[in-house]
Amino acid sequence: LGTDGYTRNTKELFAKAKELTQKRVHAYILTGSYTYPTYTLTDSVEDDIVFIDSILGVKLALSDHRSSHITDDELVRLASQIRTASLIAGKQANLTLHMGDEKAGLNPVFHALERADIPVSLFHPTHCSRNPHLFKDALKFAEMGGTVDLTCEGDGKTLEFIKQFKDTSKVTISSDAQGSWSTYNEDGSIKEIGITPVSNLKKEFISLKNEMGYEEALPFFTQNVANVLGLKNTGMIKEGFDVGLEMSGNGSAF
């Protein structure tokens, strides 16, 4: 869930994931939304991760005017809860961070890593190409061993960001599909709001494929994502692996 964790809830999200899985589209979810304390399916973040197979981590907004502006202590505590629960559950649960435009950038994460013995892999910040200062933080975070997500618009512009990473296996690309986007006036009022189309992801892959080739372009959308989420036997075309393919009218597979 995103901004709206009030009229929408984790129960509905869980039900939709279960429906998709029954239709042979493997679906996983994150508990929580932009806000803190985390809205959960059970009584706690730990129970959600330990007892519900399809929950692979927690969602939270950082450095965004719509976030709860979690304190350093609260962030360390939440990360520790996720860490402990993932060890018990045998998962690679992470804290997926919606990153906003505020100047703090990834500083809350850097502070948490300095204060506690938390693996850098537990944090996965998204929208990291939305402004120059956040992208600079993202490059630093990746050099520390962390993974980052770039949001695509379907126009191939992520290539210029990808080129700046020393290790591209640390990068995933997503579309924020069916999520809301918004722009604001100087006084903070909403200027425009809309929905990000699912098609952006496919358009971005085709654009990158034309520049980089299949083998280099595909992992950002598949293998790297599976690695971040700790999903085994998926993310690549290999004997014994689960693979989802879409066939186009001309016989091409995506």
Model-derived features with residue positions:
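Electropositive phosphate-/nucleotide-binding environments in soluble metabolic enzymes
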Residues: T10-F14, H69-D72, V76, K103, ...
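Short secondary-structure transition/capping segments
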Residues: R8-L13, T40-D43, E160-F161, N185-E186, ...
